[in-house]
């Protein structure tokens, strides 16, 4: 209730700028320069406590005035809110409205105030449109034109038919006003003739809820276990409170009571958190059908106008729901547009119809004297305080009133038409029952021209149609009309050869044709297939006979007996026709263009590991190399002291002779050098060898170095094993990468557009869904309706031509069928978004429904439905359905080209580096011998030459051979000495 008041207050705020209130300036009125064809004043009078009706009036005014592109005029409203039924005060207020130059009156007042307003309306011939009034002062047979028109239809006959529908023989009538007593009189007069057993058991006028509960206690004392059928004729809020107090009262029973709410109170909001509403039998009437397009558009516009801060403070309908509009508010909203249509009709025939009146009223300036302006008295503003002894009616009042009776529009309360007496005709009421959580379930439909039409067989119903439906009796000799439409693979025209004549059902083939044959065999009936005339499945259409088009409309109009096609079972269709058990289960799926298979790249061998892992491996390699270098600096086991030979010992060792060269001996005074094998370059070389799982000449002897090496080995063996396993799959299996894989992907990207069939069942599913993902998809599709299509063929063509930039939301059977047909360039991705089914449709109450249900279940259990589906979907496929995508292929050169490139590049790099080293070595300048200048470092007799010669390529080779020979002929420490000696070798060549 609080959220509803907030919304009403918000509408009050947004409409204030478009509506003139009683406090207005006559000077501002005189400054207006627009013509009457652009502005028409209206007077409105409301009783206090009618906030929802006032808000509906203001919103209707705003809705019309904002429609600048199509409206012919603008409405101005002068609104008065009264809190008294005093006739004198009300008369002054009415006269004040007349003096403002209004063209019609609107409002909602109490029955006591209505009599005064009604009298003034007829006296001054001022049209008065109201959502409801109790009883007309003028009888229809009086022959006089009544200038008051009520938007609320007469529903006392609906009460009578509902009582008969439930089979009640007695009722208890509770009412709160004189109007209710008059309705009781009409009910009694209609029911009594020919139904002597019917009786009104008790009648009680109640003033408040307490009085009603006390009366119920009296009924309980008189007969606790007797059935009590109570017709409750009171406002909605009082009816709600009575029911709540009844259920909470432990002294009152529940199962023995059944309430029939006579007013249109079921359109009001009934909170779902009040569990008492579902604990007792409640039946009522609704005039606002939420499935009508006009009502949906009204609620959509209300959502757009709703403040964002109130979105979470709504009722239990959900965070995005809005309070239900009451019947009185809907009728007030329709009243404004009835007047708008009447003025449009007048201005279409004669655009300047009101121009003279407007100029004369403008020049009158609100004065009661017309002589000053030179205008005709009949054209002046209406004056209630005339002293002439007679009243002057408004000259346009009769014309407007007669045009009002000819208005035909579609409003929130359904089709709006009037008879010559101004009474609503051709209207529809919904008979609903309330269940748990205040859920309303429609059980029947009442029309003023057809009476009560049950939607389903009811326990209390005794109609022959319901009886036949329950027993399943049908005429087996009758040829039943089966409505369908052409859509592969469900139904198509059979291709015939030359000279072949196809007639009747033999002209068709497809899944639905086979299904119809099997159902006819199960039921033992004959049938004839007829294509639906408009080519539609069936949607609500106010311009179609019966309110629906397509196959649904044909079933409603009894033009067909059965409909077999790919028609989805929906709650909206179930309201007007019957469905069998689903013969096919499906869901909304995503169709995209099949992506081109990716050919392996040159460096496809890198694909098994992501880019992040490769970067991590490189960083790990560098890090381990640095760690090895540093941890081998500190332990003493990584260092070896070279034992240099002394002067006395060196003389005993003969110089080494290699290739005619004399190996000189080092000087005794050179200090010892502690060498370490793990230099920076050797550390990197060791880490690389371990990573490549190859050997290396050096190993860390220290514990720290070996720990570092061990963890690096463990790391590499796991990484190499994982890489090898993934590499096999990446190199031998070709893959297709789709841009969209799940429905969530659609909402998280902007490259791929998507849509569905406009106004189809998929469109309605997203519009009604309250799931967050579906809401995002609906907002996108509703804002980009150009991405949706009018036919599935158009959507499939767009998918194929979009180069992967368009996705179509289509039912899964259609998706699978198209994917299995040439050119085989589409595919289904992701899971189904919802679950629904196709069903065989029949008119409501058809005797075939029960047997069709049994037949469908039988065909499903024995596998016939699966067989014919495979026949039309997969057995005739011309595509491979991507079976090759999971089959390993032999490796081609393109799969491993990258490693050849690396091999060739590495070899070329090695050759280039070798050449560079050679030239750099040859360009090294000559070095003086340490002993050539007679210094202490000289060693006489070591070599004949006192200087190093530039080494030739053969010199370098002999240098390496000497080093290897000495390493192989000595122990570990002696090897180190040989290495040191080899590093100081001098060669002397004989010339």
Curated annotation (Swiss-Prot):
- Biased composition of type Low complexity is found at 365-379
Tissue and organ expression note: Central nervous system.
- Name its GO BP terms in alphabetical order: modulation of chemical synaptic transmission; monoatomic cation transport; synaptic transmission, glutamatergic
> According to Swiss-Prot or TrEMBL, what is its membrane topology?
Multi-pass membrane protein
Which positions are glycosylated? 67, 195, 208, 281, 376, 385, 426, 437, 477
- Provide the transmembrane region boundaries: 612-632, 711-731, 896-916
Task: Output the Gene3D superfamilies linked to this UniProt entry.
Answer: 1.10.287.70, 3.40.50.2300, Periplasmic binding protein-like II
What the entry lists under InterPro entries is as follows: ANF_lig-bd_rcpt, Glu/Gly-bd, Ionotropic_Glu_rcpt, Iontro_rcpt_C, Peripla_BP_I
Q: Which residues form the signal peptide?
A: 1-27
Q: Where is the composition biased (Polar residues)?
A: 308-318
Enumerate the subcellular locations listed in this protein's record, separating them with semicolons.
Cell membrane; Postsynaptic cell membrane
GO cellular component, alphabetical, reads: ionotropic glutamate receptor complex; plasma membrane; postsynaptic density membrane
Function noted in UniProt: Receptor for glutamate. L-glutamate acts as an excitatory neurotransmitter at many synapses in the central nervous system. The postsynaptic actions of Glu are mediated by a variety of receptors that are named according to their selective agonists. Forms ligand-gated ion channels which are activated by kainate.
Give the family from UniProt. Belongs to the glutamate-gated ion channel (TC 1.A.10.1) family.
What is the protein name for this chain?
Glutamate receptor 1
């Amino acid at each position: 209730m609080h959220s509803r008041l907030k919304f009403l207050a918000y509408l009050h705020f947004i409409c204030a700028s478009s509506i003139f209130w009683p406090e207005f300036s006559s000077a501002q009125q005189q400054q207006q320069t627009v013509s009457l064809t652009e502005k028409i004043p209206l007077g409105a009078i409301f009783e206090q406590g009618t906030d929802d009706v006032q808000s509906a009036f203001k919103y209707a005014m705003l809705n019309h005035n904002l429609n600048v592109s199509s409206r012919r005029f603008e409405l101005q409203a002068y609104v008065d809110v009264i809190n008294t039924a005093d006739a004198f005060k009300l008369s002054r207020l009415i006269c004040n409205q007349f003096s403002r130059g209004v063209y019609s009156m609107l409002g909602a007042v109490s029955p006591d105030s209505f009599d005064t307003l009604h009298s003034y309306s007829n006296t001054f011939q001022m049209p008065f449109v109201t959502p409801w009034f109790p009883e007309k002062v003028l009888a229809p047979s009086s022959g006089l034109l009544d200038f008051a028109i009520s938007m609320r239809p007469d529903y006392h006959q609906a009460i009578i038919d509902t009582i008969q529908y439930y089979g009640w023989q007695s009722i208890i009538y509770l009412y709160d006003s004189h109007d209710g007593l008059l309705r009781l009189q009409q009910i009694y007069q209609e029911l009594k003739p020919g139904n002597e057993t019917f009786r009104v058991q008790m009648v009680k006028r109640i003033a408040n809820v307490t009085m009603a509960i006390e009366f119920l206690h009296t009924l309980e004392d008189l007969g606790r276990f007797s059935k009590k059928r109570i017709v409750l004729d009171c406002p909605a809020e009082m009816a709600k409170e009575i029911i709540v107090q009844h259920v909470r009262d432990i002294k009152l029973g529940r199962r023995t009571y059944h309430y029939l709410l006579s007013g249109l109170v079921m359109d009001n909001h009934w909170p779902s958190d009040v569990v008492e509403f579902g604990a007792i039998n409640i039946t009522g009437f609704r005039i606002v059908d939420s499935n009508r397009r006009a009502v949906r558009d009204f609620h959509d516009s209300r959502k757009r106008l709703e403040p964002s801060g109130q979105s979470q403070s709504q009722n239990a309908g959900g965070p995005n729901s809005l309070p239900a509009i009451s019947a009185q508010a809907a009728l007030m909203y329709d009243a404004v547009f009835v007047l708008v249509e009447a003025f449009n009709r007048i201005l279409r025939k004669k655009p300047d119809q009101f121009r003279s009146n407007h100029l004369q009223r403008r020049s009158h300036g609100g004065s009661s004297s017309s002589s000053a302006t030179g205008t005709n008295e009949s054209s002046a503003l209406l004056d209630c305080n005339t002293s002439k002894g007679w009243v002057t009616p408004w000259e346009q009042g009769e014309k407007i009133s007669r045009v009002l009776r000819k208005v035909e529009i579609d409003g929130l309360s359904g089709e709006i038409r009037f008879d010559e007496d101004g009474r609503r005709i051709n209207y529809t009421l919904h008979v609903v029952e309330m269940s748990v959580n205040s859920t309303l379930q429609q059980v029947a439909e009442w029309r003023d021209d057809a009476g009560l039409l049950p939607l389903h067989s009811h326990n209390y119903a005794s109609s022959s149609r319901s009886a036949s439906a329950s027993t399943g009796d049908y005429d087996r000799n009758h040829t039943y009309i089966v409505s369908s439409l052409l859509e592969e693979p469900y139904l198509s025209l059979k291709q015939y050869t030359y000279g072949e004549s196809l007639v009747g059902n033999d002209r068709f083939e497809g899944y639905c044709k086979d299904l119809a044959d099997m159902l006819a065999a199960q039921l033992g009936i004959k049938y004839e297939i007829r294509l639906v005339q408009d080519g539609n499945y069936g949607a609500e259409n106010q311009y179609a006979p019966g309110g629906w088009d397509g196959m649904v409309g044909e079933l409603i109009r009894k033009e067909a007996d059965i409909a077999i096609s790919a028609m989805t079972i929906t709650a909206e269709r179930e309201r007007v026709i019957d469905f069998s058990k689903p013969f096919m289960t499906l869901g909304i799926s995503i169709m995209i263009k099949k992506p081109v298979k990716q050919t392996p790249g040159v460096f496809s061998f890198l694909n098994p590991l992501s880019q992040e892992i490769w970067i991590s491996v490189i960083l790990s390699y560098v890090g381990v190399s640095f760690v090895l270098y540093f941890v081998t600096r500190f332990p003493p086991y990584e260092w070896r002291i070279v034992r240099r030979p002394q002067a006395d010992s060196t003389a005993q060792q003969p110089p080494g002779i290699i290739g005619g060269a004399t190996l000189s001996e080092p000087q005794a005074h050179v200090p010892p050098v502690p060498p370490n094998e793990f230099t920076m370059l050797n550390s990197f070389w060791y880490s690389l060898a371990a990573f490549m799982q190859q050997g290396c000449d050096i190993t860390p002897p220290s514990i720290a170095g070996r720990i570092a090496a061990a963890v690096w080995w463990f790391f590499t063996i796991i990484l190499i094993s994982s890489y090898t396993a993934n590499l096999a799959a990446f190199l031998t299996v070709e893959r297709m990468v789709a841009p969209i894989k799940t429905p969530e992907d659609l909402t998280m990207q902007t490259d791929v557009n998507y849509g569905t069939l406009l106004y189809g069942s998929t469109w309605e599913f997203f519009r009604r869904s309250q799931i967050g993902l579906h809401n995002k998809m609906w907002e996108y599709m509703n804002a980009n309706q150009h991405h949706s299509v009018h036919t599935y063929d158009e959507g499939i063509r767009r998918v194929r031509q979009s180069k992967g930039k368009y996705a179509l939301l289509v039912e899964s059977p259609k998706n699978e069928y198209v994917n299995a047909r040439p050119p085989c360039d589409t595919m289904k991705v992701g899971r189904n978004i919802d679950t629904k089914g196709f069903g065989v449709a029949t008119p409501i109450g058809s005797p075939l429904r029960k047997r069709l249900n049994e037949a469908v279940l039988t065909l499903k259990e024995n596998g016939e439905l699966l067989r014919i589906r495979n026949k039309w979907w997969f057995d005739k496929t011309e595509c491979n359905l991507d079976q090759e995508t999971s089959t390993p292929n032999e490796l081609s050169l393109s799969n491993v080209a990258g490693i050849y490139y690396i091999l060739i590049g590495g070899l070329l790099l090695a050759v280039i580096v070798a050449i560079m080293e050679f030239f750099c070595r040859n360009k090294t300048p000559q070095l003086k011998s340490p002993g050539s200048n007679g210094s202490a470092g000289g060693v006489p007799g070591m070599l004949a030459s006192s200087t190093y010669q530039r080494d030739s390529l053969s010199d370098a080779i002999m240098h390496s051979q000497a080093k290897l020979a000495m390493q192989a002929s000595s122990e570990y420490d002696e090897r180190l000495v040989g290495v040191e000696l080899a590093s100081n070798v001098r060669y002397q060549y004989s010339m």
